[in-house]
Amino acid sequence: MNILLVYKEADIATYKMLEGLSKLEDFNIYIASPPIVYRTKKIYGNCTPLDLPVITSKFNWNVIRALREIIKTYRIDLIYSPSSSGLSNALFASIGTRAKNIAYRGTQAKLKRFDPTYYLGILNPAVEHVVCETKDIEEYLSRFIARKRLTTSTKPFDIDWIKEAVRTPKQADDIPDDAFRCIYIGATKNRPFKGLTDLIHAFILLDDPRVHLTIVGEYGENDFQLAQQSKVSAQIHFLGQRSDAISFLVTSQLFILPSHRDASPRVVREAMACSVPCIVTDIPGARDLIIDGVTGLLVPPSSPQKMAASIRSLIDNPERLEAFAKASREHIIQDFSVKAYTDGFATLFRSIKKA
């Protein structure tokens, strides 16, 4: 079976899945991407890299022409396109060929049935199957797409992916050695749905000199001023965008996700892999990553009061916090296996090929 990945740049979970498939006798894996992608990154397993012009839009003639040549030359059976622009170009390129198109949906953004642009991609009848990141996304898409054409496959996480961060732990300046260290990682500038304002209000309500919060990621001026003008300003540390963000997780005792909506944030997996318990808002997708009362706690979104109370409950119960930390890492190892993720795709691809 000949599988083609079409993407500007896939994440490590997708590459690792393809690596696993490439080692199976019945799979030949081809990765079509701009040369700069695979020349600066390791190509995993027995995957074959193929040149593709940069995808700049949902209809790019040079990309379509190159993809069509690849489809014919390598007798492609299935095309997996994790990005919307890649999917649209692949759909055009595969017209009149035997190649079947498989899409990926990792966002909870709403679809518009009467918006023609969606029929260039995920709502196109030529899309054979859609892989959904979460059950909530699958449930929503079932309003538009037959359930038999939908599958949920949540991305895995391997603890090996945090080895470098573990080797190089970091901590914000001016945090006392005996402080209780909380952390949030995320880009929140112009994204109020990320809930950073709620998290800052929770710390103001908490008003505990023992507790410090490190915020990593691009932030808005309003949130910065809210923290700076509060009585806990010395306990909230804004680091901005950092390429080494995970290294700050390693030295933290609690990760907090205050989002109002967020599909399946990778950072929660990273925290658990680092043995850091999580407080997560009870929202679709994100809530499925933790086990409430075992690896962390769920709190209602937009509720600084409940968030503050949950933080305090873990500060005051170090034994429970330690149990959460241990269970978090075990949860990642047991329930977010790359092998299980790969096996799921192998089964899916085989069934689509036979259909």
Which residues are covered by each model-predicted region?
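Conserved donor-binding/catalytic core segment of Leloir-type glycosyltransferases
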Residues: 4-6, 174-194, 200-203
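Aromatic "clamp/platform" in nucleotide-sugar-dependent glycosyltransferases that forms part
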Residues: 241, 260
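Conserved acidic donor-binding segment of nucleotide-sugar-dependent glycosyltransferases
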Residues: 292-293, 297-304, 313-319
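Short His-centered aromatic/hydrophobic patch
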Residues: 81-87, 105
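A conserved mid-protein helix/loop that constitutes part of the nucleotide-sugar donor-binding site
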Residues: 12-19, 190-205, 269, 305
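Glycosyltransferase donor-sugar binding loop
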Residues: 32-37, 185-189, 212-224
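Short hydrophobic beta-strand element within catalytic cores of glycosyltransferases
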Residues: 277-280
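A short, well-ordered alpha-helix in the C-terminal region of glycosyltransferases
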Residues: 306, 313, 320-335, 341-347
